């Protein structure tokens, strides 16, 4: 999905950075490819401060950043739980969120449809919330599901 989304943005004149799971960078050829694409690794098993700082810097510089709110790939028609990282980064940098729905193809890179929603900003969380960015993360997922629903796709929200 990251490669498909990168290509869709790249072909429209953008060169986004990508935050990807560290496992993708273990193979030297894959590491070269993803680094060339502007990707950088995140260790999903812990609070990876290096990756978070890099992502915040990318956004503060006005660059686009591809990040999947679930933190992993999710099977078609299923839903992963939204992690709060994407929402936290958007709020802290004042960056807009561009929701994207990718309809998978039957074969690699064939039949995939990338649909962009309208950019939106997340509100700052209220003080004292247990998980201050959870509402924002859920809002991002709702926007993505709305795009899927508008395309007639089966989404976790109908």
For each feature predicted by the language model, list its residue ranges.
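Non-catalytic C-terminal accessory region of glycerolipid acyltransferases
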Residues: 50-158
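Catalytic core of membrane glycerolipid acyltransferases/transacylases, capturing the structured
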Residues: 1-46, 54
